[in-house]
Each structure stands twice: as C-alpha cells, then as structure tokens.
C-alpha cells in the first residue's frame, strides 16, 4: 500500500510541477509551488487519492517555535503523505534535506508541527469529485478550478 501511495503521490506532484512550469496552473498560491501550497496541495492530492480508492484526512499542525502551520495527509492506517514538506528546506530551525515526497512514518518535519494538530476531512470527502462545490466559497472555487486544470491537461 505504501508503494502505491508513493507512486500516486509522486506522479501527482510531478503533474503539479509540470502545470506550474507550463503556466497552466496559475491559481494562487501554486506559482511558488511547493512554498505556501501545503493546504491546497494536500486538498488536491486528497481528491486524486480518493479517486484511486485511498481515503485520507488532513493534518493541520502548528509549530511551537513560531506558530507557523503545515498541512499534510494521513490515512486511517497512519501513513503520512506529504508532497510539500520540502518547502521548509533551508529555513532556520528546520531539518535539512527534506524529501519532496514523504510517504510512510512521520518525518522529523512533521514532529516540528505537533504543538497543536487539527484533523480535518478533505473537501473531496464532503463533496465527492467536487460535484457539490459551494461556489460562494473562494477557496473551494480555487480548488475546483485547479483540479479541473490538472484533470483536463495532465491526468
């Protein structure tokens, strides 16, 4: 299962990177991917994994150092999935050489964001395949737009 999740996550990250390079994914905040993209990137990955029969929850963790946040996914079997952790490479107080794709046990970067953790259901589990998007919610609209760009051109 870990190998399959890693392959799907790796492919999905490469799709996001290609879409950014091609200037097809210009929805904020993706132009600086992976920086600042953990929330929306995790939501999009959750949708893709959901479509591949893998359900996840989103973990929104806070760092005690500076109250910053980071978001990643976790399966019911406690498999950690993170395609944006490397945004912290080179930042003071953070581990060095953070892998671009983390699938498996929590990595040292996740332990930094363990001060307060909120577990949330990704939108895909509330609105399967974004059929019932709340079009008055800007965040949901951006997620839907981004996912459809990826779906139409890369997936």
Segments predicted by a language model, with ranges:
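A structural boundary/capping signal
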Residues: 1-155
């Amino acid at each position: 299962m870990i190998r399959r999740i890693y392959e799907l996550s790796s492919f999905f990250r490469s799709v996001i990177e290609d879409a950014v390079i091609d200037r097809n994914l210009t929805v904020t905040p993706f132009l600086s991917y992976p920086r600042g993209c953990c929330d929306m990137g995790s939501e999009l990955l959750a949708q893709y994994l959901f479509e591949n029969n893998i359900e996840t929850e989103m973990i929104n963790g806070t760092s005690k150092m500076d109250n910053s946040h980071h978001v990643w996914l976790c399966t019911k079997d406690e498999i950690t999935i993170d395609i944006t952790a490397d945004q912290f490479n080179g930042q003071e107080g953070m581990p060095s050489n953070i892998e671009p794709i983390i699938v498996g046990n929590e990595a040292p970067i996740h332990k930094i964001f363990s001060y307060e953790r909120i577990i949330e259901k990704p939108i895909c589990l509330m609105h399967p395949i974004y059929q019932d998007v709340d079009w008055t919610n800007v965040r949901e609209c951006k997620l839907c737009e981004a996912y459809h760009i990826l779906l139409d051109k890369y997936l």
